[in-house]
Structure formats: C-alpha cells, structure tokens
Regions:
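Short, surface-exposed "cap/lid" segments of acyl-processing enzymes
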Residues: 1-51
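Alpha/beta-hydrolase active-site loop
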Residues: 67-87
Length: 245
C-alpha cells in the first residue's frame, strides 16, 4: 500500500562553522545537530498530539561550514526541499526551522516555492545577506539578549529589512538565554513548538506574534521586536515536556 504523503513538513537545519569543508561528525559527535534533536522530538510530538500528519526531519549537510560564497548549507536546504517536492508534490507547506548557521541557510532558502515560513533561533545574520527571497513569507527570528556568538542587533536589523522587502517578519527576544539555548531551554522549546505549528496553521501563534507579523513595511525595527516574557509569556502556547530541558 502506497504511503500517503504528509500534510506539511518542518525541515530542521542545525548550526555549524563559518568555514569547514569537511563533513560534519557522525551521530552524537555532531554537537550542533544533537542540540536540535529535542526540537525535532518536541515539534513531532506536538503534531501527533494534534492529529496532524507533519513530517519533521533534519537536513543533512555535506560540509561543516558555510564557506563564504559557496553557502554550502543553503544548497543542502534547497536539495532537501526539491526532494520533498518530488515526493509530496507542489502544494506541501513547509516551515524551515534553523539554529545559528542553519537559520542563515533557512533564510537564504526561503524563496523555494514550498516554503511558507521560517523560524530562526539565534540566527547568524550578516549585514549583507539578501532578503528579497523572503517576500511573502512569515519570518520569526528568536534571539537571546545575552548571545555572544551571533548578534541580536543584526537579527533585529534583518527583521526590519525583510519586512521592507515584503516579508511578514518579527523578532522575539529571550532575556537571559544563550546561543546554545541551554539556559531557559524549556522556554526555547515551548516557543518553537508554538511558532512552527502556528506558521503551519495547525496551532495558534503565541501572544502578539500574529500582530507583529502584520505590521506594515514602514514599521520601525523596535515595533517588530517582542519580549518573550512581557509580550508572550506565559501565554497560551503549549507546555510540552522535553528530555534535557
């Protein structure tokens, strides 16, 4: 019996290095990939509980780093999206969930026809990165105010640039978090579940996220920046137990 294709998909893209042409380590030795496993489990569990047939899977990278103009993880993301389209058809809605370098790859690949939205966690947002491919997409970027690896200020700037380019975009600040999302891990997990399922339409967006996504292109960067505790928490979004959180 042929297996029915999923109703939606979430592609998860883990972090990496600025430069590294070697393949990522296998299994648990791939620490950025290992860190995203609780997010994969949490989103998949939420979908099952709601009776939704959503495919949640990590993208495999051929190389460990971004590698300048090569933008290797971007091409890996596009290849994964093309494979999904071949398997499930042109109408499959996809949300890209990326952390750090993976968020950069997700943002770059968002112009693919299957992509409905992007959730970027502690994203790496260099000032010169393009945003035109984000037009018509929902983009929510989540960043700790204490991140020392990637810049929350750069994330706020990209959010505003994306909005001017035609995206529905906003930023959520996690006070007291960190780049690896170890501090306040449960909050990162719960928020991510709510954002991903909300963007796919199988759940409600938390707090004022929907309102922020609807801001006009001329809105100031600060208008599109929400605080997890003040604007979203504790909020109606799901509390889902995750191992290690």
């Amino acid at each position: 019996v042929a297996q029915r294709p999923p109703s939606a998909a979430v592609l998860v893209l883990h972090g990496g290095r600025e430069t590294g042409t070697e393949p990522p380590p296998a299994g648990l030795l791939n620490l950025p990939g290992t860190r995203m496993r609780p997010f994969v489990r949490a989103v998949a569990r939420a979908a099952r509980e709601d009776g939704d047939d959503i495919l949640v899977t990590q993208v495999r990278y051929a190389h460990r780093g971004w590698n300048g103009a090569r933008a290797d993880p971007f091409h890996d993301a596009v290849a994964a999206l093309d494979a999904l389209r071949e398997e499930a058809g042109e109408e499959l809605p996809v949300v890209l969930l990326g952390h750090s370098m993976g968020a950069r790859a997700a943002l770059r690949a968002a112009g693919h026809p299957l992509v409905r939205g992007v959730v970027g966690l502690a994203p790496w947002c260099p000032p010169g990165d393009p945003v035109t491919q984000l037009a018509g997409r929902d983009v929510v970027l989540v960043h700790s105010n204490r991140d020392r690896m990637t810049s929350p200020q750069a994330t706020q700037s990209l959010t505003a640039r994306a909005r001017r380019a035609g995206a529905r975009s906003c930023m959520v600040t996690v006070r007291g978090g960190d780049h690896a999302m170890i501090r306040r891990a449960a909050a990162w997990h719960r928020l991510t579940i709510a954002l991903v399922t909300g963007l796919l339409g199988s759940g409600s967006l938390p707090g004022r996220v929907g309102e922020a996504l609807a801001l006009p292109p001329t809105a100031e960067a600060t208008e599109g920046t929400l605080d997890l505790d003040l604007d979203l928490g504790p909020g109606p979004f799901r509390v889902s137990p995750v191992r290690g959180s």
